[in-house]
Every structure is written in structure tokens, then in C-alpha cells.
Amino acid sequence: MIGSFLTRGLVMVFGYAYPAYECYKAVEKNKPEMQQLRFWCQYWILVAALTIFERVGDALASWVPLYCEAKLAFFIYLWFPKTRGTTYVYDSFFQPYVAKHENEIDRSLIELRTKAGDLAVIYCRKAVSYGQTRIVEILHFVALQSTPKPKPKEKKQAAAPEEEEQKQPDLKATSQAASSNPQVRLQSKKPQLVTKEPISPKPLSSPRKQQQLQTETKEAKASVSQTKLTTLTPPGPPPPPPPPPPSPTTAAKRNADPAQPSPTEAEEASQTVAALPEPASEIQRASSSKETIMEETLRITRGSLRKARSAGAPR
């Protein structure tokens, strides 16, 4: 048994190369014979059909012993001058079958041509539309890259809490200075008592500001309730008499060192601090005044009831 590689090489030589050379010699003659040209045309028709069915035969019958050798012998049988198997196979098998189904083959070929043309047109249109969409997307992307991007608002929102954090240490420092210096505390309290301006709400951009505003509103409500309680309480003690005029020695000392506070100013500050009403004492006074009023009304009603009972009782 000859190897498959060797048989394939022999098929290429004796089935294609040598017959092609003989066909060339027949065509290039000065007066080619029609029978010889017809013979070689029939041979190449059979070889084309054999190569088509060879793929199926190799897949199904390649395991049969001497399959490759039989294929090589068939190629030689077709063109060998003594056998001339081409005329026999063509006239007895191939030509009658093709003549019987020639009309069907022509119709199927025409249908395939029309379908292939329609498919080619459809795929060309799809390719053109896809190319147009891709070009538009590329141009849009290039335009977006060329235009300057707007600055994000997140930077402003992030800068607002930083400013608040910077302001908070300043407020703490001022509160500490006010607690250490009583004059500054009095000066900071006086405008709050005199001027009560409405607090204008500012636009908020963070939850921290919202919490601060809520706390401020709660404190404002508490201060309003305390002021209402103070209005209900009876008037307090009369204000203290004005301090005597300063002596010339104290005036000279005040002019000598203006940085140090004078004793009269310290006394005034202490008197104003003492005169300021405390919220807890005011609430207690208001509650005690209400209790006394209720007790008096109860006493009056009890006395009137006793008089009515004594008047209505039989003597």
C-alpha cells in the first residue's frame, strides 16, 4: 500500500500536469483536430466534477483500503490513449444526466444570480450607513474634545465648608476674648438687647449650614419665649442712682494711662451686669405670680360659696 502523501503527488502529476500539457499541444497545432479537442474538453469536465465529489468521498470513504490508489488509476484510465475512458464515461453517464436536468440547473443559476445581486446591494447599503454613522460619531467626539469643558460646581461647594471652618476659629477667639474681658462682653450684649433685626437666611449649599441654621432658629425661638415671660413679670427694682462725678485726681490718672479701665467704669459695668435680668429668676417670678393669682381666685370663689350656703341653709 502506497502512502497517502505519495499518491497525492502522483495524482497531481498524472491527473493534472500531464493532461494539461497534452491539451496545450493539441490546441497549438496548426490544424487542430476537432475530435482531439472534444476529447480534452470532455476530460476536463469530468475532472472538475471529480474534484467536486472528491471532498465528500475523502471524508466518507478514505478508510477504504486502496482508496487513493483507485483514484489515481481512474485518472490514468480517463486519458490513457488505449483505453480512452473519457468518451465512455461522458457519453454513457455524464451527458444524459446533465441533459435531463439542464433546464432546472439553468433556472437555479438565474435565481442564484438575482439573489446574489440583491444581497450584494443590501450589504453595500448597510456598509454605507454604518460608515456614515461611524464618521458622524468620530466628528462629534472630536468636537467635544475641542470645546472647553465648564468648571464643575463641586469646587465651589467644597470651598464653602472650608470658609466656614476658617470662620469658626475666629468666632471662638472672639468669644474667649469676650469672656476674659467683661467690658467686651457688655458691649457685645448691649446691641443684642437694643437692636433686634430679622436674620436674613442665606443660601445654603451643604448639610452643615442647614444644621447651623436650625440651631440658630431654635435659639431665636427660645429668646422670644424668654422675652414674653419677662413682659408678664412685675416691674423690677428701680435703677441705681447715677455715679458721682469723677474727681480731678481720677481724671488725671485716666488721662495718664488710658489703657487701664477707671474704677467708675468698672462700677458701671458691674451695675449693668447686676441690672440685667436673669432668665431663670424671671421664669420663677412669672410662675410664682401666676400661682398667687390662682390662689387668690380660689379663695374668693370658696368664700362666695360659703356665703351662699350659709344664706340658703334653714334657720
From Swiss-Prot:
Chain intervals with Polar residues compositional bias: 173-190
Name recorded for this polypeptide: HVA22-like protein h
Disordered: region residues: 148-315
PANTHER family given in the database record: HVA22-LIKE PROTEIN H, HVA22-LIKE PROTEINS
Compositional bias segments (type: Pro residues): 234-248
Family: Belongs to the DP1 family.
Pfam families assigned to the protein according to its UniProt record, in alphabetical order: TB2_DP1_HVA22
Domain of life where this protein originates: Eukaryota
